[in-house]
């Protein structure tokens, strides 16, 4: 049931309504916690099956009300769907419009924060006198490159191609040398495919969301993505507000003894952690090359690999890993599948490098913990986040890949790791480490991070 908490006249009330993938839910939860700590009343909307996990990450605070939406087909998150059926989830979201409208009428919040898929929400919110805020879970560099009106400026009515996407849109920040490889551009072509009863593309949904909302909020800051934020503001001609990078609060959990004992056996900053999250599944060739590259370094490592829930992780690992691999690395390497205390492992003094997919939250987490970054992106905004860190900020290194198919070899993994772990006295490695340290200090400064939220709350109050 909706919240019955009494509202003070000067208390800001926001409703959070993310897309149903946990990669989207998590930033909304992080922002909810930050806003609540600054006196903002928060109500969270999601599917029933997601609520236990959401509650567990909302600082265990019962004052943040979580409301269950009903979904007619029972599909409630991307973990339950293969990628080619993700459109079904968006369609299911479209069918919640009447529920959402009734809740907004009852709750009467000042704002509703929403995600890319709910292109219909700005109009719906306006009809009931509520302002809508598009909260982008993606980096500004990504949105500025892909989902801006000028993306179609040179297309002239024809269908967009991956060759178009290899180049930045007209007006893209001139000081940026960002472009996409062929395999990266191909990954974004799904955004221009029509699906669902409304026959809209993902690009059209995002553009409508950004174009019709009251204003836009990004989980970044000018220091990191200034030129891209300015470009987006120019493209959509509306305020772009910032929450800051939403640096996660330190975990109150304790690292499991099996991990702490293993890590304690190695020197400071010598261990490589390699992990790609719960919804990224590597192919056999990718596993073989990645595992072999880690082996070639001669350094201790933890390799976390996950697989679809309908497969046996043990069987998949036995098939995909190089023959005799576990025996060869048994004294310095661990291959793990399943739940993993990533934040606590990154914090351990023995961990010195994080090989990840370039998800923005993962990158921030690594930089706060002073772990060197090796970036191996697989989809979407991960490609841009990796380029931002490696090219713009020069605070990490991206694994070299072939242009056409994204293929990488064990030697590419080795070279990237050598740059930040074994050749830190050479110019490139030295520069990366120095830049990384500066960004780590910036992100770890609680006064700076607190000011981002203080300023955002002040702006929200002034615009309510």
Curated annotation (Swiss-Prot):
It comes from the Eukaryota. UDP-beta-L-rhamnose binds at residues 278, 357, 362, 365. An anthocyanidin binds at residues 24, 380. It holds the Pfam family UDPGT. Its EC number is 2.4.1.159. This is UDP-glycosyltransferase 79A6. Gene3D superfamilies: Glycogen Phosphorylase B. SUPFAM superfamilies: UDP-Glycosyltransferase/glycogen phosphorylase (SSF53756). Keywords: Glycosyltransferase, Transferase. CDD domains: GT1_Gtf-like. Expressed in young leaves, flowers, pods and pod shells. Barely detected in seeds, roots and root nodules. Flavonol glycosides (FGs) having rhamnose at the 6''-position of glucose or galactose that is bound to the 3-position of kaempferol are present in cv. Koganejiro, whereas FGs of cv. Kitakomachi are devoid of rhamnose. Signal peptide: none annotated. Belongs to the UDP-glycosyltransferase family. The active site is at residues 24, 115. Flavonol 3-O-glucoside (1->6) rhamnosyltransferase converting kaempferol 3-O-glucoside to kaempferol 3-O-rutinoside and utilizing 3-O-glucosylated/galactosylated flavonols and UDP-rhamnose as substrates. Prefers kaempferol to quercetin as an aglycon, and 3-O-galactosides to 3-O-glucosides as a glycosylation pattern.
């Amino acid at each position: 049931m909706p919240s019955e908490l009494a509202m003070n006249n000067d208390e800001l009330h926001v409703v959070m309504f993310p897309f149903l993938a946990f990669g989207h839910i998590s930033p909304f939860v992080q922002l909810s916690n930050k806003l609540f700590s600054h006196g903002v009343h928060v109500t969270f909307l999601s599917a029933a099956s997601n609520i236990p996990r959401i509650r567990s990450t909302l600082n265990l605070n019962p004052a943040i009300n979580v409301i269950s939406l009903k979904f007619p087909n029972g599909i409630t998150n991307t973990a339950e769907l293969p990628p080619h059926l993700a459109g079904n989830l968006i369609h299911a979201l479209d069918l919640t419009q009447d529920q959402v409208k009734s809740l907004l009428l009852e709750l009467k919040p000042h704002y509703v924060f929403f995600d890319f898929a709910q292109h219909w929400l700005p109009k719906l919110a306006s009809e009931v006198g509520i302002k809508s805020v598009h909260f982008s879970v993606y980096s500004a560099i990504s949105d500025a490159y892909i989902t801006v009106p000028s993306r179609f400026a040179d297309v002239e009515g024809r269908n967009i191609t991956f060759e178009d996407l290899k180049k930045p849109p007209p007006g893209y920040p001139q000081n940026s040398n960002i472009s996409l490889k062929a395999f990266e551009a191909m990954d974004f072509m799904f955004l221009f495919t029509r699906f669902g009863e409304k026959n809209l593309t993902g690009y059209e949904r995002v553009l409508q969301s950004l174009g019709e909302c009251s204003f836009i909020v990004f989980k970044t800051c000018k220091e990191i993505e200034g030129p891209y934020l300015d470009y987006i503001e120019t493209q959509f001609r509306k305020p772009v507000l910032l929450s800051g990078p939403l640096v996660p609060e330190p975990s109150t959990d304790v690292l499991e003894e099996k991990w702490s004992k293993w890590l304690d056996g190695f020197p400071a900053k010598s261990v490589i952690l390699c992990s790609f999250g719960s919804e990224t599944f590597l192919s056999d060739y990718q596993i073989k090359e990645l595992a072999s590259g880690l082996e070639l370094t001669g350094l201790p490592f933890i390799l976390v690999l996950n697989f679809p829930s309908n497969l046996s992780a043990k069987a998949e690992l036995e098939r995909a890993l190089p023959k005799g691999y576990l025996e060869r690395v048994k004294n310095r390497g661990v291959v793990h599948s399943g739940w993993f205390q990533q934040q606590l492992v990154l914090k351990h003094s023995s961990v010195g490098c994080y090989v990840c997919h370039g998800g923005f939250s993962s990158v921030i987490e690594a930089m706060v913990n002073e772990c060197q970054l090796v970036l191996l992106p697989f989809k979407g905004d991960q490609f841009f986040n990796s380029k931002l860190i490696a090219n713009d900020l020069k605070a990490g290194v991206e694994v070299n890949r072939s242009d056409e198919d994204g293929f990488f070899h064990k030697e590419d993994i080795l070279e990237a790791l050598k740059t930040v772990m074994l050749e830190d006295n050479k110019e490139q490695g030295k520069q990366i480490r120095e830049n990384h340290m500066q960004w780590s200090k910036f992100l770890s400064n609680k006064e700076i991070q607190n000011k981002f939220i203080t300023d955002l709350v002040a702006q929200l109050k002034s615009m309510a």
